[in-house]
């Protein structure tokens, strides 16, 4: 009976907290410090910031959309709203208008913007999580594991609180393979592969995939290989979760796991 009462109390309290907290969304904020001569960069490299106005020192999720580096647009997932945290949804330049490494450069610039600006809105820059779905998860891993991208912005990738990816590519992204003239089914690990940069001191990483029998391009196996290489290199805080019965589209069931990671 005690446990039932406690559960009811927690539910009522959390609903009451959500109702009392006001949220604001700022749209199309440019994340490069100075406009360049590249018109496409100036048009595309923007982010939306959703944040609680009545709380302080909240965590922030930087969210990169999917689309194979060829399509997609910034969107704040509904499941991340009204959870006492900020969400930064990022647009980045897309193929064929650009090629690698422009996608990664944009992702790093967006993460750098969050580190440099989130405190102005009440957030805690020590609680920044970098997350994404599919190619967005790929970008999350690249800017975290390959330290050179954030180093260009005078930031340490190890300052990221954690990484959660949903159905991410961990080998060289298939669109980049196409840029090389390769078939997308031909595996490649080079400088543009997250697994190439597996290292011991990286932030905590949670890898989530769909069912290995239903996922795209051996996605589960790629994630399993990254986790194995992280462990071999001495990385301690990593998880691999396979969601049975689901294919590539796992955002709806994956985001609750992301929230659980943040709330640990």
Residue ranges and their predicted role:
Residues 29, 115-178, 189-190, 194:
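Primarily recognizes the serine-hydrolase "nucleophile elbow" in alpha/beta-hydrolase
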Residues 224, 231-264:
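C-terminal catalytic histidine-bearing segment of alpha/beta-hydrolase fold enzymes
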Residues 57-68:
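Short beta-strand element of the alpha/beta-hydrolase
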Residues 154-158, 162, 168-176, 184-228, ...:
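The feature captures the conserved acid-bearing segment of alpha/beta-hydrolase catalytic domains
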Residues 19-55:
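N-terminal cap/lid segment of alpha/beta-hydrolase-fold proteins
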Residues 1-24:
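Bacterial Sec-dependent N-terminal signal peptides
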Residues 73-90:
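Short amphipathic alpha-helix adjacent to the substrate-entry channel of hydrolases
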Residues 98-119, 142:
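Alpha/beta-hydrolase active-site loop
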